[in-house]
Amino acid sequence: MGWAEYSFRQPTIPGDQLTIRATEENTANSWSVEMINEEEVVCVVGKVGLGKADWSSEFVRSTSLTPTEEGQKKKSLTLETAEIGVDWAAKKADFTVEAATEFTSEKQRTNNPLFVGSNPIAHPSWTAGWAEQLMRHNYDIPSSMHTRSRIQHLNVVPVGTQVIGAAHVVGAYERKAHHFVNFDVLLQDQAGEDIAQLRHWTIFKIATLEERENVLG
């Protein structure tokens, strides 16, 4: 059991080399983390720790955990259609050796024996990726920009697990012409055991340069 929280301060692009600095904090079993690019710009800040995070009790649990099929007609997400306090449609996915291999060879490259081979468990980033997947399961989102997350990991995900994910909308707002949505995610296995809970912030409508200039002056 462990947790992570992080915020993206500056964009990173393919080819960037990031230095990761982890500093143990005074509190037990927690570390502050920074990811810094070659120009010494801090791009990501966060904390990680063991056990349960202080904020883990703040999550809103979804009650709509019956998954719906892909291919349903999706509407556009707007500030008006975000439906604060409503559960999104749930989705399911099987964690297989093939899924693990694809993820660790194409998205989060690693040769850590925990996450590769014939009997891997899911990489924590695979779990974190569920938030954006659930948003796109419910809405037609051409592009988005993930800005912040809190993740409470509760169980590992071994091969053969069927994962069911659901989300509950916490808020939607505009900031500097960008349109944000904030939602909580609950992941469970086929036996109804909790795998993880997430709180996710993302820009679902990225402002154009003209829109930002109009707001910022």
Q: For the regions a protein language model found, what residue spans apply to each?
A:
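HotDog/MaoC-like acyl-thioester-processing domains
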Residues: W3, F8, T12-T81, V157-G217
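Long amphipathic N-terminal alpha/beta scaffold segment
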Residues: M145, V156-V157
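Hot-dog-fold acyl-thioester-processing enzymes
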Residues: M1-G2, G49-R148, A207-G217
